[in-house]
Amino acid sequence: TAEERGLLGSKYYTDYDPLVPINNTIANLNMDMMGRADPERGVRNLNYVYIIGSDVLSDDLHEINIDANKYSNLELDFRFNGIDHPDQFYYRSDHFHFIKNNIPAIFYFSGVHEDYHEPTDTAEKILYEPYKRRVKLIFHTAWELANSKERIKLK
């Protein structure tokens, strides 16, 4: 979605051509850079995912995500969650344009690596087992959102 040039795809989607009208959009679950390992963690502990923004606009979204983790048993790591974090990950992926439109969002992320935004970031470097567990968490979060009788509340 052209995030390397200012998140243009998500901006276009939210501002001009949403598949689902923005006022009917419940949440955005953004998966970006989830298939690798954070070098700080190494390959010893791959059973994690960084969670960014889940509690900014909705406590309900945050709690649904935590509850959905019973199916994947990941370490939900919130170290980058702060909107004032020096790395500014909260502002650096496609979920941000949804948040700007008052749509709660979660940015799922496994960390920056040496191939970040480089042509060397290729499919054979994906770590599929931890990726599968991360996707399982997102699936169950989405399932709960889609099947809930009530819309999640905004703060």
Locate predicted features.
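His/Asp/Glu-rich mid-to-C-terminal helical/loop segments that flank catalytic regions of hydrolases
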Residues: 109-155
